[in-house]
Design a protein with these regions (language model features):
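Gly/Ala-rich beta-loop-alpha elbow adjacent to hydrolase catalytic centers
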Residues: 111-115, 119
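Short glycine-enriched nucleophile-adjacent loop
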Residues: 119-128
């Protein structure tokens, strides 16, 4: 799938902050008309899109600057303390729960900003996610030296190699 498609699907998820779940669902479904995707599940932090070929895309939404939990998560990641953050752990669990019902290598993970950091962390810290996800593509991921140290702790050479194969970081201007 093209990077542009992933970026658009990720951006649609932000409707949940602006409009609430019910109205956001309508707006997202309207935006998806005529595409190869449908919205399967929508939560504030995680959305699942289903492709017409049966594969799925799990998007982890980024920071809502009006949400204190998001700001706290950003601070913890900046300090290399994301392992103590409830949003990091709950969204990783949501990803794992979704993947339990999917064929291996049929799930793509996508995230923007804080969501990109959570996807990156999930890939680094969960062998089951790392081994079974098809790919992960993230946009303008929040990243610091301390977060990097936290993520690389305990990773073997082959884990790092697999991350390089499956995880693509995109940096866009004006975000």
């Amino acid at each position: 799938m093209p990077t542009e498609t992933y970026s658009k699907l990720s951006q649609l998820h932000y409707h949940v902050d602006k409009h609430g779940k019910k109205k956001a669902t309508k707006k997202i479904n309207k935006a998806l008309e005529g595409t190869d995707y449908s919205l399967e599940k929508l939560k504030r932090g995680v959305a699942v899109y289903r492709h017409k070929d049966g594969s799925s895309l799990v998007n982890v939404k980024g920071t809502d600057i009006t949400n204190k939990k998001d700001i706290l998560s950003d601070i913890k990641l900046g300090l290399g303390l994301s392992k103590h953050d409830k949003q990091f752990s709950s969204r990783r669990k949501q990803i794992k729960d979704h993947m339990k019902n999917e064929d291996a290598n049929s799930v793509t993970l996508v995230g923007h900003s804080l969501g990109g950091s959570i996807v990156t962390s999930a890939m680094a810290k969960s062998k089951s996610i790392r081994d079974n996800v098809k790919s992960a593509e993230v946009f303008n991921t929040g990243y610091t030296k301390e977060f990097g140290k936290e993520l690389s702790k305990g990773l073997k050479k082959e884990d790092k190699s697999l991350l390089k194969q499956k995880l693509i970081h995109n940096h866009t201007e004006g975000d």
